[in-house]
A protein has these predicted regions:
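Conserved GTPase G-domain substructure that encodes guanine base recognition and part of the catalytic core
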Residues: 1-172
């Protein structure tokens, strides 16, 4: 019988549809079940800027989750995820919460949705993050948080691609 896992999705101000992320997860569900022996449920969490402190300090620590995916929109004025400003409190709370109940630490991914900064279709198909998005976030994260050793940062235009499914399987 497959182990049941819980994956929580987070987005501020409903700037990106979490259903798109759930589509990525659902497309990998048969492989996760067959190859890794686990199934999952998904819960959506939208929050406002004014709720970030409470979310980070009270809500997230109380959640029982195995994995978290934090989703931001590429066109947000500032993609400040892990540099001490912006979404830092939320992201770090997710990293802490997903590490407390597992042997592996910090099981939180970052998705940058609506990223139309790929050079061409070939680059988009072969990369799980655009060069533009990598430049934006690379100063905020060590390489192992970008390349799958500890986490992943994905970006895509309208929806995920096969490379994202493969990367997700690698990480799980």
């Amino acid at each position: 019988m497959p182990r049941q896992r819980k994956i929580d999705l987070f987005n501020c101000d409903q700037l990106y549809e979490l259903r798109v992320i759930e589509d990525l997860l659902n497309s990998s569900k048969p492989m996760l079940h067959d190859k890794l022996g686990f199934d999952f449920t998904v819960e959506h969490h939208y929050f406002s800027l004014t709720e970030m402190d409470e979310l980070s300090e009270k809500v997230i620590p109380a959640l029982k989750m195995d994995f978290a995916i934090f989703v931001v929109h590429a066109k947000e004025s500032r993609l400040s995820i892990n540099d001490g400003r912006g979404y830092t409190k939320v992201y770090r709370a997710l990293m802490k919460a997903t590490g407390k109940n597992s042997k592996r630490l910090q099981q939180c991914y970052l998705v940058i949705g609506a990223d139309d900064n790929y050079k061409n279709e070939e680059e988009e198909e072969q990369s799980f993050i655009s060069p533009w998005a990598r430049r934006i976030v690379c100063v905020q994260f060590n390489e192992e948080y970008l390349d799958g050793r500890k986490s992943f940062v994905f970006s895509w235009g309208e929806k995920h691609r096969q490379i994202h499914v493969e990367a997700l399987m690698h990480f799980f």
